[in-house]
Amino acid sequence: MPMPTVSMSPALTALIERAVARVRQSLPVEQAWPGGEFDRQLAQVALASEFALDTLARQPALLQHLAQPDPPPLPLPQFDPAQPQLWPAQLRRYRSAESTRLVWRDVLGLDSVEATLAGATQLAEHCLQCGLQALEQQFHTRHGKVVAADGSVQRLVVFGLGKLGGGELNFSSDVDLVYAYPQGGQSDGARPLAAEEYFARLGQQLARLLDETTADGFSHRVDLRLRPFGTAGRVALSFAGMDQYFQREGRDWERYAWLKARAVAGDIDAGEAWLETLRPFVYRRYLDFTALDGLREMKAAITAEVARHDRLDDIKRGPGGIREIEFLAQSLQLIRGGREPSLRERRLLPALQALVAAGQIDQENGQALSTAYRFLRRLENRLQMLRDAQTHALPQAPLDRERIALGLGYAQWSALLDALAPQRARVAAEFAELLAPRVRATAPDALADYWRALPDGDAAPLAGIGLNDPDGAHRALADFAQSSGVRALSDSARARLDRVMPALLHAATRASQPDAAVRRMLGLLQATLRRTSYLALLDEQPSALARLVDVLSRSALLAERLAAYPLLLDELLDTRISGPLPDRAALHAACAHTLHIDDTEAALRELNERRLALSFRIALATLDGRQQAVESTRQLAWLAEAVVQTVLHLARSDMLAAHGHVPGGSFAIVGYGSLGGLELGFGSDLDLVFLYDHPREVDASDGKRPLDAGRWFARLAQKVMALLAAETGAGRLYDIDVRLRPDGGKGALVSSLASYREYQRDRAWTWEHQALVRARAVAGDAALCDAFAQVRRDTLMRVRDTAQLHEDVRKMRARMRAELDRSDAGRLDLKQGAGGLVDLEFVLQAGVLGLAAQQPQLLDACDTPALIDALARTHWLPDESAAPLHQAHATLVDAGLSCTLDRRPRLIAPTPAIQQARGIIFNAARGQGLTFPLGKDETAL
């Protein structure tokens, strides 16, 4: 017998020779010995697993199967309903044989660690499914099938938790099961049972079939203790009972347990559908750092158990063990999985990859943890393969140590320990970092004492930290401390608040506007006290706390949005926040992702949350000076465009379901104003115009409830508007203004392409053609969008009388100045004031209207920067004026966006930079004979 090509002790050599000889002796005379390479392979397996050799001695027919180059899975056992007494032996022999095949493939390097874990999982599922199927038939004969009140037949659902649910079962593991059934009822057989008793008995018999140890061993150890109420709970619960339990009794550790849950036998479809309803329990909708509290408690209990039983050599529960990797990944999944569906992953290794992709673990750490996990799981499997024992402890017996080390390719035990130590150390360090004690710059004792003493005490401690109005801040803090929200906090939440408040006050002293920071901070806390997960975030993440106070001090708008939509706090922690912002395609993809949600209301809410988060990122980039305001307004327009396209898809789907579609019909949404001109602000409304077209011979939709074509498209436009303005838990998407449609407020909401073309040709005012310069199709059918673009070109390329054009432009500007300019002697209206943004727009629009007939390339532009460049290329604007006009435009947009971010009206005292920008715009207007009236602001010029 060739022995493995490693140096073994004489004792181990003799042991392997005896094991192989025993297998040879068990071989029937008529069965040929495979021979050749098989001898070496068998000796290699004998080194790693007594269990495998024992199985081969009892089932020598398995030898021929394993002698194949790539031995496939064994056929499932076939249970005879008439001979249930044979089922346990059949199941156990199958499990032993298939487990031996897994050992064979693992030891000989045919399978990766992941494949071995998946194979062990599939084996457990097959045993559960075969056993349950046989028992169900038996129960049908005795008791009939369970029928609910609605007449539907009910089946048992077997949920696999832990590693079974995650598809990563170790070689000799127990299986964590929970039994449930969709609805109550009664069986319809000769000996009827209520559903609860029926499924409890069925589940208990399934557990016994797998778990009992017989002369043939066991199939799988079954653990039912993770069911609701544990050993005190019912063996099987209806889905309604499960729902009630998790709503009222669900605990933090159960979120970890059910994160990996999967329906593995019985009515799998019903089980998976119910698990989807449990998702909000496992993954909270909002950022949830309270998950770390549950993790700390579980880790403390495990640490105590390890110490109590001297289990430092336990590679599962001990320091740097498998459990720490699992806890680390699962805690990050629970914290963010409610917001990021990609993190809702049952399997550990893909979960680590998802966390890296989401920026929650850096690439190097993610790779290190994955490597450590594979190392530990491979070692764990080999420990268990030795004797099919449910062990995670490193062996003490010298011979066992030698077998494990040599089987894994190490010359001696010490070499294996040397390889193991850095893996465990890396895991322990990463896990300790996650659960590290809260580290932050310690707030001065005076502030901590001040907060705890409220409402007693005075403002003296606040006077020394740089507040301009310490008395006002003191009153606000005292009122907050006595508020009903604070008084209603649990002890643990109050303890968090007592840690957070001094740190917040300390951070406020370093803010650019300390008084504003304190005032806005209290508003945010008051709005979020009901969700203690946000207190946990600030308690666990000092960097987020500092960033929050900085943002609050500099932006009243973002302070309001954070208070109204605390889910935005997640953005302060996202490592991607300081990187490049999403481009146009990424914004569209982010919004379109919501279309996979079947429920329109839920899709709308998700879309709004994404819009809020993305606009918040754009605002932070603007606030931090990481990009120019002109870029921010362009991105906001792209975002709005993506939202409108998504909403149109939702609205059209609803219309198709209710009324069918208009054959050959098309629909388009045109963006005017700041949306069309790619210069949208934070909180800006959207100027929209709706167009439609359809073949003349088609006069109605083709659904069950048909509408005439015009009415169908009007309903579609109304639905788009309703969805855009609908209130959701995340607010509403946009305010809509449709007054720029043909005939304004008196006109039809939706225009046919023909009527729109006729209106622009025959009845539109010059100012409407000016508005058309900045218009572009933002959503809808491509052919109609192209047709609109052609109408726009035809309209704007009309030959015009320059004098009349300039007169019309000046009159409209004078009218707007009189009605809309809010400037006064000391402040300029950045948009409507003299030399403001609208003056610049009018100059550019006049240039396009006057020149497009000779220079049609001008019509390729619709936004201010592109229009400046296009008109400069035609020399209508002097070449040397382009750069100054770009700068003037950027200066005014930046000033306006700064006002918006701090919730101030866009009225400011002109600075030298503003005055310079206005002068540039005045000069450009004068150069084209377009001197606009000064209006209210003339004294400031």
From Swiss-Prot:
KW Lyase (keyword) present: no
Pfam families: GlnD_UR_UTase (PF08335), GlnE (PF03710)
SUPFAM superfamilies given in the database record: Nucleotidyltransferase, Nucleotidyltransferase substrate binding subunit/domain
Keyword Nucleotidyltransferase among record annotations: yes
Region (Adenylyl removase): 1-437
Enzyme class, first EC level, given as a word: transferase
Reactions catalysed: [glutamine synthetase]-O(4)-(5'-adenylyl)-L-tyrosine + phosphate = [glutamine synthetase]-L-tyrosine + ADP; [glutamine synthetase]-L-tyrosine + ATP = [glutamine synthetase]-O(4)-(5'-adenylyl)-L-tyrosine + diphosphate
Record gene name: glnE
Cofactor list: Mg(2+)
Coiled coil regions in record: none
Record's protein name: Bifunctional glutamine synthetase adenylyltransferase/adenylyl-removing enzyme
One GO molecular-function entry: ATP binding
Keywords: ATP-binding, Magnesium, Multifunctional enzyme, Nucleotide-binding, Nucleotidyltransferase, Transferase
Family the UniProt entry places it in: Belongs to the GlnE family.
EC number(s) per entry: 2.7.7.89, 2.7.7.42
Record's GO cellular component terms: cytosol
Function: Involved in the regulation of glutamine synthetase GlnA, a key enzyme in the process to assimilate ammonia. When cellular nitrogen levels are high, the C-terminal adenylyl transferase (AT) inactivates GlnA by covalent transfer of an adenylyl group from ATP to specific tyrosine residue of GlnA, thus reducing its activity. Conversely, when nitrogen levels are low, the N-terminal adenylyl removase (AR) activates GlnA by removing the adenylyl group by phosphorolysis, increasing its activity.
Lineage, broadest ranks: Bacteria, Pseudomonadati, Pseudomonadota, Gammaproteobacteria, Lysobacterales
Region named Adenylyl transferase: 444-941
GO biological process: regulation of glutamine family amino acid metabolic process
InterPro entries: GlnE, GlnE_rpt_dom, NT_sf, PII_UdlTrfase/GS_AdlTrfase
